[in-house]
């Protein structure tokens, strides 16, 4: 739902402005969260979760707002800092959610989400001004414009770089639980603690990107990030295949994938949205 909604959230933000769209999606998120809190059936809960996912598509506007405010190089730096902060939540949310669920029941995490959503809505309403002058083009026309973006060779380079970096990360997310529990034999709780390492690596990479992208350039930072990630994958593969598999052989080297992706993805995102700033 989030992926599909992102195809439309950008054109809508271009047509009506960033602020109105964010206010609308934040309100939808709060209403959807209330639906989850007071759900009396699994169907009602699923509808609420889908609506949460739809409203969460507005997360893409954070990068667009940064691009509205800063030039190409500075935008890469700022996106690095923003994604560093965003990496904190996936690191600790499973632990916090499990803790709240055990103490107060399954509705408790949704209450916390409602509190966060309320704070976000207040921040947008009281602090965020409009950063983009809305266009007269219709949403359908803006979507057609996006197809013209696909004819730009440069944007495909950024897309491919982002796709491959993300693919390596999601391959790790899908395979690490099986390898950790079934091959190495660690407990799920221990595995969860090791997962934090890659998240911390991603934060480190985001910090490096935010600190140095403007100085050395987007493309150079993406290359360095790819090299760091490849070193981590190669080292983990060597250790796991040539020695008795251990949990450290899996996660310690793969934390470099987090570092590399933290260096690569903010710059790929900034580069992609800079190819056609008019869109």
Residue map of PLM features:
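Conserved MFS/SLC helix-loop-helix module at the cytosolic interface between two early adjacent transmembrane helices
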Residues: 3-42
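C-terminal ends and interior cores of transmembrane alpha-helices
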Residues: 27-40, 228-244
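Residue-level signature of mid-helix packing/kink "hotspots" within the transmembrane helices
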Residues: 2-7, 57, 90-91, 199-203, ...
């Amino acid at each position: 739902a989030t992926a599909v909604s992102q195809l439309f959230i950008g054109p809508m933000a271009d047509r009506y402005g960033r602020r109105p769209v964010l206010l609308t999606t934040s309100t939808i998120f709060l209403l959807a969260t209330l639906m989850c809190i007071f759900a009396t059936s699994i169907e009602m809960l699923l509808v609420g979760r889908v609506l949460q996912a739809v409203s969460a598509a507005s997360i893409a506007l954070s990068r667009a707002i940064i691009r509205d405010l800063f030039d190409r190089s500075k935008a890469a730096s700022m996106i690095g800092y923003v994604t560093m902060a965003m990496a904190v939540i996936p690191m600790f949310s499973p632990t916090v959610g499990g803790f709240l669920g055990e103490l107060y029941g399954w509705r408790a995490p949704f209450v916390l989400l409602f509190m966060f959503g309320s704070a976000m809505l207040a921040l947008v309403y009281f602090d965020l001004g409009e950063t983009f002058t809305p266009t007269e083009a219709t949403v359908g026309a803006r979507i057609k414009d996006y197809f013209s973006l696909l004819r730009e060779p440069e944007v495909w380079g950024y897309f491919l770089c982002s796709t491959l970096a993300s693919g390596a990360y999601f391959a790790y997310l899908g395979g690490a639980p099986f390898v950790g529990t079934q091959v190495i034999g660690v407990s799920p709780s221990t595995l969860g603690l090791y997962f934090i390492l890659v998240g911390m690596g991603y934060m480190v990479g985001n910090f490096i990107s935010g600190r140095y992208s403007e100085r050395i350039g987007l493309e150079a930072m993406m290359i360095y990030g790819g090299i760091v990630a490849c070193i981590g994958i190669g080292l983990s593969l060597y250790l796991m295949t040539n020695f008795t598999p251990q949990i450290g052989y899996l996660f310690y080297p793969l934390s470099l994938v987090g570092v590399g992706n933290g260096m690569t993805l903010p710059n790929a995102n900034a580069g992609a949205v800079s190819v056609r700033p008019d869109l």
